[in-house]
Amino acid sequence: MFCHLVFVNLDPTAPALADESAFLSDEIMSYAPDLANLTHAHTLTYRIQANWKAVVDNFLECYHCPVAHRDFCTLVEMDTYKVKTHGIYSSHMAKAGRGDNKAYGVESASVTDHAVWYLWPNTTLMRYPGRGNFMVWRFYPDGPEQTYEVFDFFFET
């Protein structure tokens, strides 16, 4: 168990995720203290005609956000958006939950920050403004030009 989630490594000699990821657990639990109480609500799977490394690289930068994700940029205070790299993971944090945004309603939101963690090599953990939530996003390569993305959504009930 790691942050109330199950991670499996089939290599019996591999170091523990907690040892490899330094403060990731503390960081996640500080932004998502309700994680143990969230319920799995839905899974989405997409097939993308792109190399998985290009998909991950695109995710890891937000230079394209003002053009490709305009509503997201009204939800998140982009001038506070910071990316920090910590060994095998990176943190993407910003103040968020602006009531005047164009993305979706956040009135009475219990989550008011945008917090995302990319865990090398193919997992992203996300917390968006709104009601209690958490998303796990995985990238699976299927050849040099195709990637499967799987999103698991967890919400408060």
Question: Which stretches of residues belong to each language-model region?
Answer:
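C-terminal catalytic domain of Rieske-type non-heme iron oxygenases
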Residues: 4-157
